[in-house]
Amino acid sequence: MYRGLLSLIIVFILTSLALAKNEDKILQALIYEEHGQFQKACNIYTNLFHENNESIYLQKALLLALSSDLKQKKELLKASKDFLEHTAIARLNALYFFEIGDYKQAEAILYKLIKEEQDYRNYEILGDIFAKKALYTKALEQYNIAYKLFEHESLLLKIVEINIKNKNIDQAKKALEDFSKKSGCTFKTCTLLLKIYQEQKNNKASIQILKQLYKLHNDIKYIYAIIELLVQDKDYTQALDLTQKYNIDSDTKIFLYTQTKNYQKAYEIALKRYELSKEKKYLSMAGILEFEIYMNPKSKKITDPKRLASIIKKFEKSVDVRSDALYQNYYGYTLIEYDIDIAKGIELVNWALEQEPKNLYYLDSLAWGYYKLKDCKKAYEILQKTFHDKEFSNSDESKEHLKAIKKCLKK
């Protein structure tokens, strides 16, 4: 139901000297309205109407009675029949008929009102009736007329909703864009616009809307959403700039630094985070990042025994059966590859496979472990499970392992 503006009454009070004697009662009614005590407010307006027979009191009482379904609704509707020459009261009657589903009577009142006045509400209610009847083209026509008379958000959203129903996405988008340019970003309009941009894979426009939503609500989730889109676009530098400007978590920073291959910075954050929180996963991250920093670019291996010992120590302190599969596999593969403890390495990789049974990298690690144990037949059987993925099978490491295992089988 539609609720009138309080300013209507305030203006009425200030301009009507004849009603000065009722100011206290009207102010009390306004206070009741402000606090949501609509029955008490309606009682005052109803009494004022009975005492003065003034249409403005009937209008206010009827509006409250209809919008809050109050006890004197029928009484006031009956009384309003003698005041239908007042457009506001006639419109309330149209609303009542609309609410009870008597569209014929509602339309008759509205068409009469449209002849008498160009008030956007007449067209909007008529549009609502057509929308209820699923006559969306007619509804849109009325909403557009109403919107030309008064551009407000609730009307815009009705126009957008029908355009989306009719698959006119570009028209819906344009209406939202035009409104946001004129009136600024609101939560509803910008959220709808964001949804359209995201469905159209328009990351650049989505980021601009997310920035506006962040200014509107100061909610960090919008910054995270921007970072996610920048990652999709592989714009890691700009994403990192946001992590410096806002309070972004360490995991996101570590991820972004690894994407830019700044492993040293990622390593420093991971180690610092471990020292502060004692969360084992950060020590595991530090182990992986230390490997990336110091491995030989050509052989992809650690050649310094002291550095390898430092990495292994980090894994020993942080990786167990409850760890993420990624860390279990990385630690296990390191033990296998460097012939440190092949049996333990296989156990760790099996833990990882319990979590992710179809992970190609983990299967490759397990196959390599059995190759190191000279069980080449089993190694080949396991490696065969990765052959369906051509991209993985064509990787240098996979081809190297397959070549070694096949050579072993011929012995």
What residue spans do the PLM features occupy?
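Register position in tetratricopeptide repeats
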Residues: 34-35, 64-68, 99-100, 132-133, ...
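Alpha-helical repeat scaffolds
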Residues: 42-46, 71-83, 105-114, 137-147, ...
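Start-of-helix register in tetratricopeptide repeats
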Residues: 23, 56-57, 88, 121-122, ...
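Canonical tetratricopeptide repeat
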Residues: 59-61, 91-92, 125, 158-159, ...
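Alpha-helical adaptor scaffolds
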Residues: 288-306, 316, 320-356, 361, ...
